[in-house]
Design a protein with these regions (language model features):
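Intrinsically disordered, low-complexity segments enriched in proline/serine/threonine
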Residues: 8, 20-22, 42-47, 58, ...
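Bacterial N-terminal signal peptides that target proteins for export
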Residues: 3-24
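Outer-membrane beta-barrel proteins and related beta-barrel translocases across Gram-negative bacteria
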Residues: 138, 144-160, 168-196, 201-209, ...
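N-terminal signal peptide c-region/cleavage motif recognized by signal peptidases
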Residues: 32-34
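Short, linear, compositionally biased motifs with a strong N-terminal bias
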Residues: 15, 29-30
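Initiator methionine at the very start of the polypeptide chain
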Residues: 1, 37-38
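N-terminal amphipathic/hydrophobic interface segments
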Residues: 38-192, 207-226, 260, 285, ...
Length: 836
């Protein structure tokens, strides 16, 4: 039976339609909602010429009939208010007075808007909107469902009661039971003698019990009084008052505490407090107690906006009981758009701040909770701005910055050299494709970008060395302050096709200095003007590799890519040119195909070098994924490089070491990487790196690594008065992995060993215990640093849907175990998951 009625109780009519075993009722709330067809809205005007607005979608004219428009996805419309929503009733049978008292019997339901009421039988009074539910009562409202033996409530859920309810909250996957439920408003539900958990009834590992729990859907939070936390049915904590979010939205309040043990600080406990200032701003206050040092206060402030974003962090320990002094740290990172588009572009001006500093040399070692943080010895304080010029000057980018350093000396008398401060640096860069690539109407390239490319850059820097606050108390050069101007220019003409490429290039660099030595008797700083010419070229050959299809299980392609790179730079004596920001570039596959063996602006290597290389690739024919890559390269120097970092090279060599690198991805997710550097004059490898990993499925990984470095003999010189014999300086092994021991327990570990010192470098042993609503992690870690061993014991209990308690071993596991994957969190519920 379908029942149409007006909420006011007049002008009602009844339309009977026989339906087997069920009667369906529909209650109209306003006379205007009775089936009155409305003509479609007028079509928008057509686009004017030159307009960028999208063309309208034309809907065929069907006269006075509303036409449904096809759509490619289900859309959630604007919700209808309760006073305008229709009321539906469904049951096996219905009797009573239509406008006064209705009795729905057998699988009864009442639906209105986002409210669904179900029971075996429902007595419903439309005038008062009150329903009495008898047998298997159920109320679904928004993201919550309540079930009990019987209930009395208003259908709009503004008031009512339910006995012995069981409830579920979809967004947080929470559930619980209570002695009684009282519905105070449409959004506030109060439970007496209630429980709360995110566990399933089959695995009730933890739950909260409370005298009273109040769920507020408007504020999207749950509040409770006299709460007791139960773990494996054992009370572990009493909470007089607690508040938890019922959605993913942020909320101010106490976060779970962080606890652990460290051999330097003793027992370490932090109680975070989160402040949700605004949707784009928040603050976390971090009071921290260390049994061997005292109480530290820390904090983190975050902000984000279309034109700016920033993070400010800091810690302050008023009196370190172990060190006998105040300790502090700050870290400020800021991005700011002053003008134009925040993403950059012509006319945009963007600024930034990266500033960090600590109170003393040992602060990172004493207080950092990560390996990377504990070995940090240098902090930057950098402020700058960059802008792309507008209009016809848009090929130019200008910038300015100041940069100072705090260099720590944690291992005195061994010292760390401090770099020069830059106060300030002003740069201007120009780059233009004189003949840009052409493209079709679809935006795809018709011709590759093969036109000439020109570039020009200028750099003015003022270097300063703060001798008074640095150890050692002499500058790394003979100058304590200097001005340097660098001008670079280049013109290149790349030609590229699918089978080959040629890239000729000419460039120059000019350096000029205005510097005074801090001691008399030294020659003034020497500048230079040095040109360079280079030619980079390569070929590409490819064929089907049917013979490898059986090994890899699919069609494969084999390619060979020979490459030749020649560079010529005349020799210019730079023995009297100072060093401010320059060092050796190192030696690897990327460095061997480069113009300069130095990084920075104070040295230009003399070149008459030809580098030859060959790369072979095995790729999947269907996807292009690389399964194996092998590279061989060697450089020949026809005259021998004479320019060195700290002076001229006395006996330059004509041939470089031979480089070999290979990377293989076998079936079964086994990967192997090998790198070797072979010295042809000494007939031995001077550097070897081998790594391998097996990751058959997520959460399973085994890793192996080996590294060996051998240094050839170094003769004494004016810049190195001691010299050194040939020796192996590195010979290290490491093993790591993650593997499940059972369905619920996984083991994580790492072992690093140095065969030269016969010492264990680092050890990690960790266990993860995972259930549907509970994750427990524990880790034991030892790290050998500067002949001192630091021991950590970390533990963490993650109550899913509630929070995390304990120190965070996940970061430690990610850092030590390549491929480590923490236990995945449950998927966020879909808006249709509990669709009624």
């Amino acid at each position: 039976m379908i029942h149409y009625r007006l909420r006011a109780g007049f002008n009602a009519f009844l339309l009977l339609l026989p339906i087997p075993r069920q009667v369906v009722g529909l209650v109209l709330l306003q006379l205007a909602n009775i089936a009155i067809a409305q003509a479609p809205a007028p079509l928008p005007p057509m686009n004017q010429s030159g307009s960028n607005a999208p063309a309208p979608i034309l809907i065929p004219d069907r006269g006075e009939v509303t036409v449904l428009k096809l759509d490619d996805q289900l859309r959630v419309g604007k919700p209808i208010s309760d006073d305008k929503a229709l009321t539906f009733t469904i049951s096996d049978s219905i009797d009573g007075v239509v406008d006064r008292d209705m009795s729905l019997k057998g699988r009864a339901q009442i639906r209105r808007n986002d409210t669904v009421v179900k029971a075996d039988n429902i007595n419903y009074a439309p005038d008062s909107d009150i329903a009495n539910l008898v047998g298997n009562a159920e109320l679904t409202k928004n993201n919550a469902t309540f079930k009990g033996p019987q209930a009395r409530l208003r259908v709009d859920a503004r008031e009512g009661e339910m006995e012995s309810p069981y409830y579920e909250i979809r967004d947080s996957r929470a559930s619980g039971k209570a002695k009684n439920l009282t519905i105070q408003t449409s959004d506030i539900f109060v439970f007496d003698k209630a429980t709360y958990t995110t566990c399933t009834p089959e695995n009730l590992d933890w739950y909260f019990s409370a005298d009273q729990i109040e769920i507020d859907n408007e504020q999207k939070e749950m509040r409770g009084t006299s709460g007791v936390m139960h773990l494996f049915n054992t009370p572990i904590a009493y909470v007089p008052y607690f508040s938890l979010p019922t959605s993913k939205e942020r909320k101010s309040g106490l976060l779970p505490p962080v606890a652990g043990y460290n051999s330097k600080n003793g027992f370490d406990v932090t109680q975070p407090y989160y402040v949700n200032i605004a949707p784009n701003r928040d603050l976390t206050i971090l009071p921290r107690y260390m049994s061997e040092r005292g109480v530290q206060l820390g904090g983190s402030y975050r902000t984000i906006d279309p034109r700016y974003s920033g993070v400010v962090m800091g810690d302050y320990l008023p009196y370190d009981q172990k060190a006998g002094r105040d300790r502090w740290r700050y870290d400020w990172q800021q991005r700011q758009n002053f003008l134009g588009s925040p993403g950059g572009g012509p006319g945009a001006i963007n600024g930034y701040v990266n500033a960090a500093r600590v109170s003393d040399n040992l602060y990172p070692t004493d207080f950092s909770q990560t390996v990377a943080g504990s070995v940090t010895s240098q902090f930057r304080q950098e402020v700058g701005a960059v802008s792309q010029l507008p209009g016809s000057l848009s090929n130019w980018t200008v910038g300015v910055k100041t940069l100072t350093f705090q260099t720590l000396q944690p291992n005195l008398p061994s010292t760390v050299g401090a770099p020069y401060n830059i106060l300030p640096q002003i740069t201007a860069n120009y780059r233009s494709n004189l003949v840009p690539p052409s493209s079709g109407l679809d935006g795809k390239y018709i011709t590759l970008p093969t036109g000439p490319i020109s570039s020009l850059s200028t750099d003015f820097s003022r270097f300063s060395y703060n001798i008074a606050s640095s150890i050692p108390n002499t500058a790394p050069g003979i100058f304590s302050q200097a001005d340097r101007t660098v001008v670079k220019g280049a013109l290149e003409y790349p030609q590229a096709t699918p089978g080959y490429y040629v890239r000729p290039k000419v460039s120059f660099q000019s350096n000029s200095y205005s510097a005074t030595a801090f001691q008399p008797g030294y020659q003034p700083a020497q500048g230079f003007l040095i040109p360079t010419a280079s030619l980079d070229s390569g070929l590409a050959f490819e064929r089907d590799a049917t013979e490898m299809g059986r090994f890899f299980g699919q069609d494969m392609l084999l390619s060979l890519e020979p490459r030749a790179y020649y560079v010529y730079t005349p020799y210019i004596n730079q023995a009297n040119t100072p060093l401010f920001d320059t060092g050796d570039a190192g030696f690897g596959v990327s460095q061997i195909f480069s113009e300069n063996t130095f990084i920075g602006n104070d040295r230009i290597s003399d070149n008459n070098k030809l580098t030859g290389g060959l790369t072979g690739r095995i790729t999947e024919a269907n996807t292009g994924a690389e399964r194996a890559v092998v590279t061989l390269a060697q450089r020949q120097d026809f005259t021998g490089q004479r320019v060195g970092l700290t002076g001229n090279i006395a006996s330059p060599t004509k041939y470089s070491d031979t480089l070999a690198a290979a990377s293989v991805r076998f079936m079964g997710n086994f990967n192997a990487d090998i790198f070797g550097q072979y010295n042809t004059q000494l007939n031995r490898f001077v550097q070897t790196t081998v790594g391998g990993s097996w990751r058959p499925t997520p959460g399973r990984s085994l890793n192996f690594g080996y590294r060996n470095v051998w240094n050839p003999p170094i003769q004494a010189s004016p810049f190195n008065s001691i010299g050194s014999p040939a020796a192996t300086t590195t010979d290290q092994y490491n093993l790591s992995g993650q593997w499940p021991l059972s369905r619920e327990v996984s083991a994580v570990g790492r072992w690093g060993y140095d065969s030269l010192t016969t010492k264990t470098l680092n050890t990690l042993v960790a266990l993860e215990y995972t259930r549907d609503c509970l994750v427990f992690r524990s880790a034991y870690s030892q790290l050998l640093l500067n002949n001192n061993t630091t021991t950590q014991i970390l533990f963490q209990i993650e109550f899913r849907g509630l929070g995390v308690a304990g120190d965070n071993p996940v970061d430690l596991m990610k850092l030590n175990v390549p491929g480590y994957l923490p236990t995945p969190k449950p998927l966020a519920p879909s808006i249709y998951e509990n669709y009624q």
